Amino acid sequence: MQSFKICFFISCLSVVLVKGQFGGTVSSNPNGGLDVNARLSKTIGDPNANVVGGVFAAGNTDGGPATRGAFLAANKDGHGLSLQHSKTDNFGSSLTSSAHAHLFNDKTHKLDANAFHSRTHLDNGFKFDRVGGGLRYDHVTGHGASLTASRIPQLDMNTLGLTGKANLWSSPNRATTLDLTGGVSKHFGGPFDGQTNKQIGLGLNSRF
């Protein structure tokens, strides 16, 4: 497994070293600091059919654990498959495979479906899987919502989550936005059976 992770990371890195494209996001965090996500990627193909490989890193300007990893993805006509490996300091590592399918898009409303499986190895030795899927809706004005269901079989825990986003302001090129976000999730079974989590926030986000 370790050798696969090393080969996977080297493959992604070798792809992006040839005219890689750098980009990312900076977002305000209600708990302090700024969340910074950066990635270097290379796309082969066109907008309708392509293969993308890259490396990424994420962290907060106030400190805390940083995450880094690599990914590969193949897309065609709005459908796609992806594979990602990530490592978070003082937490563990995850290998995630996912698929998404385009269901509807009339240039104003967009609806997509997705499914995923992740395998996480914690630094303390505990390993667990997470499988699930969901639906995501996006409006051309920047509003959106998503519904996700997942299961961790090792804990016999199922989770249902709903999130939403309302765009309050956007720059002319839509690279910077002010969004109101909220979400609610509930656990069924496992150590958090019956627990409901709610969150709401106001965030400034910028793409570079």
UniProtKB/Swiss-Prot annotation:
- GO cellular component terms, A-Z: extracellular region
Q: What induces it?
A: By bacterial infection.
Residues forming the propeptide are: 21-47
Quote the subcellular location field of this record: Secreted
Q: In which tissues is it expressed?
A: Hemolymph and fat body.
Query: Which residues span the membrane?
Result: none
Q: What is this protein called?
A: Attacin-A
Species of origin: Glossina morsitans morsitans
